Amino acid sequence: MADADEGFGLARTPLEPDSKDRSCDSKPESALGAPSKSPSSPQAAFTQQGMEGIKVFLHERELWLKFHEVGTEMIITKAGRQMFPSYKVKVTGLNPKTKYILLMDIVPADDHRYKFADNKWSVTGKAEPAMPGRLYVHPDSPATGAHWMRQLVSFQKLKLTNNHLDPFGHIILNSMHKYQPRLHIVKADENNGFGSKNTAFCTHVFPETAFIAVTSYQNHKITQLKIENNPFAKGFRGSDDLELHRMSRMRSKEYPVVPRSTVRHKVANHSPFSSETRALSTSSNLGSQYQCENGVSGPSQDLLPPPNPYPLAQEHSQIYHCTKRKDEECSSTEHPYKKPYMETSPSEEDTFYRSGYPQQQGLSTSYRTESAQRQACMYASSAPPSEPVPSLEDISCNTWPSMPSYSSCTVTTVQPMDRLPYQHFSAHFTSGPLVPRLAGMANHGSPQLGEGMFQHQTSVTHQPVVRQCGPQTGLQSPGSLQPPEFLYTHGVPRTLSPHQYHSVHGVGMVPEWSENS
C-alpha cells in the first residue's frame, strides 16, 4: 500500500510545473494563500482518460483560507493526531454505477526545512529525506459513484504521526517541514482494487490545504484559530492569546508524574514556617531523644507542646537515627520519663527505642497476685487458705481434665534448648510440658486479655524431665527454666482461646517460690 502510488503513476510532488499544466476541466488555481471569489471552486491537478467530468469541491474552504493566510500548522505526535480543519470534499461527475476508490496521501510541498522566528516562518535548511509514501484509503472504499456523490466525503479519521516505525497506517511526517495533501479518485478494477497499469484515476490538489508539521503550535494566531473553530477545544475559550498559546505548547509535551510525598517534602523545606514548625512539633514521647542529642536537660512533660498532627519528614529521620549509644550516654536517671533499653536487643544495629517494662524478678508475690486478680480474667480460688498461693493452686478450665494438686504431683521441669524462631501461641503453648505444671482449672470462661498482660518470646523443648516433689520441696522458678532473653509487647491479641490464655498466664504470672517456701 505504501508503494501503490507508483503502481498507477501518481506524481510524487503535486506542485511540479508539468502537473499544473495537466490541469483539466477546473478553474485556474489561485495563488498560494490568495482568497478566491468562488469559495467552492474545484481544483484538479491530474486527470486520466475516462475520468473527465469529475469535479471536487473543498468543504469549509473559507476556514482553510483563514489558516492558510496565517500559515497552517498541523500537530504530529507519536500516537497520531487528526487534522484540523478536517479534510472534507464534495464530489460530482462520477458514474453512479461504477465503483470508485477514494484515497489520500500527503507529499512534501518543497525541499526546505522551516523555523518560526520573529513571528514568521523562514527557511532554515534543506529538508530531511522524505518518509516512504503512505496512502490513506477511505473506509467506504470501494463504493459506487452514487454513494460518493450522495454526501460529503470526510477524511477526518486520517492521523499524522512522527513515528517512523508506526504500525497503524498513519501518515508519517517530519516536523518543521511543509506538506501538501492530495486526493485521488481511482476507478476500481474487476477485483475491486487498484494498482494495475490500466487503472484510471485522477488527482485533485487544493493549495490552501498545505501546512507545516509541528510537534507544538508555533504561531499563537494558529492556536487562537484552532480554539475558536475546533468544537473539541471549548475548554480553552475565554483565555487570552498568550495563555492559550502557552497551554497549547504544554499539552504537546510529556511531563513526569511527581509523587505527592516529594511535593510535600519540597513544600516543607521551602516554607517560611518550616523551621518554626519543626521546633514546635516535637511530640511528648520524643522529647527526651532530642534533648539527649542536644545535651540539654529536658523540661517536664507538661511543658512539651502538643504533638503535631502533620509531622514533617525531618522528624522521622531524627527518630530513626537515635541509636543505642545515645541512650547509654543519657541515662534514665537523668531523664526519669525516658524508658531505658532492654538488656538484650535483637541486634547491635537496633536503631529504634524499645520501651522498658518492669521485670518479673523485681515484683513481689503479693503485687503480682493482686495484678493478676485485676485482669479481665478473674481467677476463682477454691483452695483452703493454708495453701501457699491460693489464687493459682486450684485452677481449672472446661477444656482440660482435672489433675492432682502440686503437693502430690510429678512436676515436669523444662530443659532449656537452643532458641527457635518465634511461633504463635498455639504452636508452643498447647503442647504437653506446660499443661502438667498447672493444677486443675476451675470452670470459667476465658474473657478478654487485659492491657497489662505479658507474653514471652521463647520456644522450649517438649521432652520433659520428671522428678518427685513433696510438700516441702519448692517449685522451681519459671525464670530459671527459660532462656535469658524475653520480649514483652503491648500488642497482645484480645481474643485468645482458653488454653492459650491460661498458658501465658501460668508462665508469665506464676510466683517465684524459693526452696524454703
Swiss-Prot record:
Q: Where is the composition biased (Basic and acidic residues)?
A: 15-28
DNA-binding feature ranges: 58-238
The record's SMART domains line, in alphabetical order, gives:
TBOX (SM00425)
Q: Which residues carry this modification: N6-acetyllysine?
A: K338
PROSITE patterns found in the cross-reference section = TBOX_1, TBOX_2, TBOX_3
Q: Is DNA-binding one of the keywords?
A: yes
Give the GO biological process terms.
Answer: animal organ development; atrial septum development; atrial septum morphogenesis; atrioventricular bundle cell differentiation; atrioventricular node cell development; atrioventricular node cell fate commitment; atrioventricular valve morphogenesis; bundle of His cell to Purkinje myocyte communication by electrical coupling
Q: Where is the composition biased (Polar residues)?
A: 271-300, 357-369
Ranges of Low complexity compositional bias?
34-45
Q: List the record's Gene Ontology CC terms alphabetically.
A: chromatin; cytoplasm; nucleus; protein-containing complex; protein-DNA complex; transcription regulator complex
Q: Which GO terms describe its molecular function?
A: DNA binding; DNA-binding transcription activator activity, RNA polymerase II-specific; DNA-binding transcription factor activity; DNA-binding transcription factor activity, RNA polymerase II-specific; RNA polymerase II cis-regulatory region sequence-specific DNA binding; RNA polymerase II transcription regulatory region sequence-specific DNA binding; RNA polymerase II-specific DNA-binding transcription factor binding; sequence-specific DNA binding
Region of interest: Disordered: 1-46, 270-313, 331-369
Q: Describe the processing and modification events after translation.
A: Acetylation at Lys-338 by KAT2A and KAT2B promotes nuclear retention.
Where is it located?
Nucleus; Cytoplasm
Q: Which CDD domains match?
A: T-box_TBX4_5-like
Q: Identify the stretch annotated as signal peptide in this record.
A: none
| Keywords carried by this UniProt record | Acetylation, Cytoplasm, Developmental protein, DNA-binding, Nucleus, Transcription, Transcription regulation
Please give the subunit comment from the record. Monomer. Homodimer (via the T-box); binds DNA as homodimer. Interacts (via the T-box) with NKX2-5 (via the homeobox); this complex binds DNA. Interacts with GATA4. Interacts with KAT2A and KAT2B.
Q: In the UniProt entry, what is the domain comment?
A: The T-Box domain binds to double-stranded DNA.
Known role: DNA-binding protein that regulates the transcription of several genes and is involved in heart development and limb pattern formation. Binds to the core DNA motif of NPPA promoter.
User: Would you tell me the protein name for this molecule?
Assistant: T-box transcription factor TBX5
